[in-house]
Amino acid sequence: MRNPDIGIDDLTALFIADTPLIDVRAPVEFTQGSLPGAVNLPILNDEERALVGTTYKQQGSEAAIKLGYEMVSGSVKQNRLQQWLDFIHQHPRAILYCFRGGKRSQITQQWLRDTGIDSPLITGGYKRARQFLISTIDRFSEHRKLLVITGPTGSGKTRLIHDISNSHPVLDIEALARHRGSAFGGMSVPQPSQIDFENHLAVNLLKLEQNNLSEPVIVEDESRHTGKVYLPDSFFHHLRNSEIIWVDEPLATRVDNIFEDYILTTPIGQAQRIRQAIPPLASTVETREILRQQARQLFDKYAGALQAISKKLGGDRFQEVSEDLENARSDFENKNEIQSNKIWIEKLVRYYYDPLYLGSLQRRRVNPCFKGSGQAVMDYLQARK
């Protein structure tokens, strides 16, 4: 008995279950945007797809299909078929899709059936699933309440959201964007494409819709852009018009938080701990040198981020913070000391982040329903349940 294909009514269950997907589109299409849970195992590579497309325009559908079969035959066909079979062997629930649920996924499905494997495909393909995900964002933004955690840079907003994630519905936008949302906030892994960001956001919202429907989803206050990706209009408008809680921590605590995130838990802090350990931590010379090189690259990255905001800082303050950063680099290289990083961090917060963030909140005329320390906010949230 054949497995039924996946219609529009089945997409909710598919995404909630993190179903493995085989995207048989060309790599160039996959890179622009794909469905969460998908691996790209194309039936046509980029060059073959382009040739088929040209033939379709010039000679019509029949000639294009004939060319496709000719190019993907013999050992080429067997290699691609084996890739699909290997993936399905590891993920028996895998589902196929192409752009519109047309020839590419249908032919893939038939070739698999010829081997005795029956894999469903998404009816309407990527295009229909993408429309479903966009509508999910719009529906969520209209019907589900948000509770927005705001506060100056270093207040520990992201950490707070992680700490309450087992007891409250939360959404971590920065994790989805793979960016901490500041000039210095790029992570070690590349950001997703805009389409991939939206698709993963939609799946997270879809999962949040399944439980605690009366309880607001807790989310960190974000600008429209987080790094190079941006929030869809409907969701950003909802975010800006939702109830707000303000995390209020003293400057010293905020500097400590930033120091932990950007120095202590990075290769800078790791390299420093290995070098100062008595007895020495078990590590190879190669490992120590890799960490040291990564630490140098991170200092270079911070210097570049500082340069990018130099005009907003102003010449004198930019020069001052730059010198503090270079002094911290020198202390790390020559003394294995990292505490001096707090000097440039503290000045960057006072000179740049506080005026920027607090000015934005004032312009928005934010009126929080609660304001207090991180612990006080956690207690307040628990009392609201």
Curated annotation (Swiss-Prot):
Alphabetical list of Gene3D superfamilies matching this protein: Rhodanese-like domain (3.40.250.10)
UniProt-listed CDD domains: RHOD_YbbB (cd01520)
Alphabetical keyword list: Selenium, Transferase
Keyword hit for Transferase: yes
Class of this enzyme: transferase
Ranges for domain Rhodanese: 15-138
SUPFAM superfamilies for this protein: P-loop containing nucleoside triphosphate hydrolases, Rhodanese/Cell cycle control phosphatase
GO molecular function: transferase activity, transferring alkyl or aryl (other than methyl) groups; tRNA 2-selenouridine synthase activity
EC numbers for this chain: 2.9.1.3
Transferase listed as a keyword: yes
GO biological process: tRNA wobble uridine modification
Reaction(s) catalysed (UniProt annotation): 5-methylaminomethyl-2-thiouridine(34) in tRNA + selenophosphate + (2E)-geranyl diphosphate + H2O + H(+) = 5-methylaminomethyl-2-selenouridine(34) in tRNA + (2E)-thiogeraniol + phosphate + diphosphate; 5-methylaminomethyl-2-thiouridine(34) in tRNA + (2E)-geranyl diphosphate = 5-methylaminomethyl-S-(2E)-geranyl-thiouridine(34) in tRNA + diphosphate; 5-methylaminomethyl-S-(2E)-geranyl-thiouridine(34) in tRNA + selenophosphate + H(+) = 5-methylaminomethyl-2-(Se-phospho)selenouridine(34) in tRNA + (2E)-thiogeraniol; 5-methylaminomethyl-2-(Se-phospho)selenouridine(34) in tRNA + H2O = 5-methylaminomethyl-2-selenouridine(34) in tRNA + phosphate
Membrane-spanning parts: none
Active site: 98
Record function comment: Involved in the post-transcriptional modification of the uridine at the wobble position (U34) of tRNA(Lys), tRNA(Glu) and tRNA(Gln). Catalyzes the conversion of 2-thiouridine (S2U-RNA) to 2-selenouridine (Se2U-RNA). Acts in a two-step process involving geranylation of 2-thiouridine (S2U) to S-geranyl-2-thiouridine (geS2U) and subsequent selenation of the latter derivative to 2-selenouridine (Se2U) in the tRNA chain.
Family note: Belongs to the SelU family.
Record text on subunit structure and interactions: Monomer.
Protein name according to UniProt: tRNA 2-selenouridine synthase
Protein's organism: Nitrosomonas europaea (strain ATCC 19718 / CIP 103999 / KCTC 2705 / NBRC 14298)
Taxon lineage: Bacteria, Pseudomonadati, Pseudomonadota, Betaproteobacteria, Nitrosomonadales
